[in-house]
């Protein structure tokens, strides 16, 4: 072995990363149970160490809009249960950018359009304030990863990416000062919906404080094959969180090969969590969350060496 090859071994070991096991699995609490306490019991039932937060379970209020005292109480409740927050899901920039014509609102009445435009402008104007609230919540809850979006999708999203990058730049600067990472989700209704669009935006903004929340199933709404095709386009070092839609682990037309995805991401050095976002709405939502979590754990257990595999739940 040459000296150069020998010196490369530690770097290669770092890149390969650790295998995906139960310690890397998380779940969005408001989709697994109707109350915070029941969400904690769900996590404990499956031996989870992490949860993702979005809305308070049983409420439509996002955690970022809680008071400091409410956030501290939530953080204590989770810590007392042995749980940490892997990701704070916000709705930042999940609305139409003022001055654009979103595809989904083409048939609005004049009255509805006027109300929406006023609402969108107000939300745009307070984006930095909402970002600061999200960062405050993240600090109290003990996470450094915050989800953001890229405005409601227009007919030609790629043409709008430079303007989106321009808007994101000062937000990323705030994130850098506050030592948090803003993770852009590829969302079907937004301008960044596919892995190709994620990759293009990341190239425009190379800061390590802007990264990716990869929701593998979301790109299929625009004809993308998430794995391996979409995944191969992503800058792997920018992936900070992964979300697993329920329908992508249960047998059916939207099933994805998560065993292969887990193995590929471990090889590529991914060190973050994988959060269940059940998203099978209706009276069966919480039941489906249990089914999905059992299947996720079955998959990760099947990838573990026989001596370290966990017992099934």
Positions of predicted regions on the chain:
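Glycine-rich, proline-tolerant flexible connector loops at the mouths of alpha/beta enzymes
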Residues: 54-75, 151-156
């Amino acid at each position: 072995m040459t000296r150069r090859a020998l010196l490369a071994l530690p770097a290669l070991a770092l890149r390969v990363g650790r295998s995906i096991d139960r310690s890397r699995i998380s779940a969005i609490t408001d989709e697994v149970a109707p109350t915070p306490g029941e969400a904690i019991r769900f996590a404990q039932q499956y031996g989870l160490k992490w949860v993702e937060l979005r809305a308070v379970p049983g409420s439509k209020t996002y955690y970022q809009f809680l008071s400091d005292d409410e956030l501290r109480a939530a953080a204590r409740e989770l810590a007392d249960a042995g749980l940490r927050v892997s990701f704070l899901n916000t709705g930042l920039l999940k609305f139409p950018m003022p001055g654009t014509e979103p595809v989904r609102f083409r048939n609005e009445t004049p009255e509805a359009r006027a109300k929406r435009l006023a609402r969108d402008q107000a939300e745009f104007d307070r984006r930095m304030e909402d970002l600061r609230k999200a960062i405050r919540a993240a600090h109290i809850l003990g996470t450094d990863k915050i989800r953001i979006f890229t405005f409601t999708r227009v007919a030609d999203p790629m043409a709008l990416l430079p303007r989106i990058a321009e808007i994101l730049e000062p937000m990323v600067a705030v994130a850098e000062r506050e030592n948090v990472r803003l993770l852009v989700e590829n969302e079907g209704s937004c301008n960044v919906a596919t892995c190709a669009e994620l990759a293009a935006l990341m190239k425009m903004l190379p800061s390590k404080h802007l990264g990716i929340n990869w929701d593998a199933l979301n790109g299929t709404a625009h004809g993308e094959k998430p794995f391996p095709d979409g995944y191969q386009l992503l800058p792997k070092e920018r992936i900070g969180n992964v979300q697993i839609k329920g329908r992508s682990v249960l047998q059916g037309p939207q099933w994805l090969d998560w065993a292969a995805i887990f193995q590929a991401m471990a090889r590529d050095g991914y060190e973050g969590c994988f959060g269940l976002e059940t998203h099978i709405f209706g009276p069966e939502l919480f039941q489906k969350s249990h089914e999905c979590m059992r299947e996720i754990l079955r998959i990760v257990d099947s990838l573990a060496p026989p001596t370290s595999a966990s017992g099934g739940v």
